[in-house]
Amino acid sequence: MKPVALIARLLLGITFLAFGLDFFLHFISSTVPFPGLSNRADDYLSALSRAAYFFPILKALEIIGGLGLLINRYTALFAAGLFPVTLNIFLFDVFLGYQLLPLGVAMILCNAALLYAYRRYYKFLFTVRPAL
């Protein structure tokens, strides 16, 4: 499991770091043409961007999480913390942005592999009656 976790950690870290930085620096989105999104996908992204705070905070968290995964610090925390972001990316790709589905599938698989690899760190969260 160690090689799988290492590859998943590095791929997910690079992906989050690259797309997080791209939001602020525009080095991918200005050079790589992304496939056209459906009207529903455009409406969804437009609605999210109307809240001016949403994308800057999300992308800052992606950068921090990506760096944490890449330098292997607090990996279990970042794997769990980034899972809702990864799940939203995956569901967006499934229901709205079909052309980007391979990226969403790869990200959800990498995040699931990390959650599985670090599962012993989450066991205490599922204690029914924790003792103080």
Where are these regions (language model features)?
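Membrane-interface interhelical connector segments
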Residues: L25-L48
